[in-house]
């Protein structure tokens, strides 16, 4: 097993994930099957579903699809009872720390946390019960230039095995470009196989929101899912646009089962009518023909 060469191989010294490569470059062994990953999106301390592209710093928006009257702990407890591992809590702006801690305390080790994560606070969120921390904007400067030193600090602080890199993106002339700052600012980084190869040794997973379709319930970005599935070397979760069970099946088909999916606004527990939570719980409990686990360890 080996890590990527060059300057990236120096990051974290001893904390880097080595990726075992199969005949087609995949580290996931056995039959791959797309899983449902739950989410708790927090805005102003409440569980909400919003249109991703409507997040702004200018006081306008966001466009809210749903505002829950239930506490974050209610959702976390349901995810725990149904063994829906690998979900994420996302803090959308300030005023969400207490709500995030409430969710994490309800299921210690069962949820990831993202939103305002940096090397300075990552450890405290792991101590609060997060299984992993999710980071995007902290890896770029104000102009969208990638900060190698920041990734080095994070890997040294918590280890690559506790880090999820969020490469949420927008469609551009070059394909898909990573967007930061609540998806308002495009960075210098495109989502390509080369980018994934470059970053994979330094994280446990990738989380990728298709920001242009997030919250619209008009279908997934199948081209992006296909690109991610064709790579498939470490776990990847896609979010954006899933409106029906057919969209979940499209993620399974387009990625050959190598990409997991998050569903938000279309889900009945978030006020939607396109997807039923219980159906997705049952989906995760299905087994491949040989009876092996969905994503074997």
Language model segments and positions:
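Charged helix-capping and loop-helix junction motifs
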Residues: 147-151, 188-193, 218-227, 276-278
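Conserved beta-strand positions in the central sheet of alpha/beta enzyme cores
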Residues: 88-89, 134-135, 164, 207, ...
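Conserved anion-binding
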Residues: 47, 53-58, 130-213
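C-terminal helical cap(s) of enzyme catalytic domains, especially alpha/beta-barrels
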Residues: 145-146, 151-154, 249-254, 258, ...
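Glycine-rich, proline-tolerant flexible connector loops at the mouths of alpha/beta enzymes
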Residues: 84-99, 137-143, 209-217
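Catalytic cores of alpha/beta
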Residues: 103-106, 111-112, 117-129, 223-257
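Conserved, mostly hydrophobic/aromatic
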Residues: 41, 125, 165, 206, ...
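N-terminal active-site wall of soluble small-molecule enzyme domains
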Residues: 57, 68, 72-128
């Amino acid at each position: 097993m080996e890590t990527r060469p060059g300057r990236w191989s120096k990051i974290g010294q001893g904390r880097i994930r080595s990726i075992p490569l199969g005949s087609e470059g995949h580290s996931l062994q056995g039959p791959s099957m797309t899983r449902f990953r739950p989410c708790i999106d927090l805005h102003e301390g409440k569980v909400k579903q919003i249109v991703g592209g409507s997040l702004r710093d200018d006081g306008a928006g966001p466009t809210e699809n749903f505002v829950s009257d239930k506490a974050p702990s209610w959702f976390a407890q349901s995810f725990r009872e149904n063994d829906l591992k690998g979900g994420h809590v996302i803090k959308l702006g300030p005023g969400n720390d207490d709500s995030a801690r409430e969710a994490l305390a309800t299921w210690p080790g069962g949820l990831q946390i993202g939103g305002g994560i940096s090397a300075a606070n990552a450890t405290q969120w792991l101590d609060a019960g997060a299984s992993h921390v999710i980071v995007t904007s902290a890896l770029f400067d104000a102009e969208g230039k990638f900060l190698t030193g920041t990734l080095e600090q994070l890997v040294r602080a918590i280890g690559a095995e506790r880090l999820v890199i969020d490469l949420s993106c927008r469609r551009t002339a070059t394909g898909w470009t990573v967007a930061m700052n609540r998806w308002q600012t495009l960075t210098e980084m495109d989502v390509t196989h080369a980018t994934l190869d470059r970053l994979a040794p330094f994280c446990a997973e990738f989380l990728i929101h298709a920001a242009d379709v997030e919250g619209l319930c008009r279908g997934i970005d199948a081209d992006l899912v296909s690109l991610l599935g064709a790579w498939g070397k470490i776990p990847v979760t896609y979010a954006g646009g899933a409106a029906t069970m057919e969209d979940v099946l499209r993620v399974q088909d387009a990625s050959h089962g190598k990409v997991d999916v998050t569903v938000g606004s279309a889900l009945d527990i978030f006020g939607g009518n396109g997807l039923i939570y219980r159906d997705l719980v049952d989906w995760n409990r299905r087994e491949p023909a040989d009876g092996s686990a969905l994503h074997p360890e």
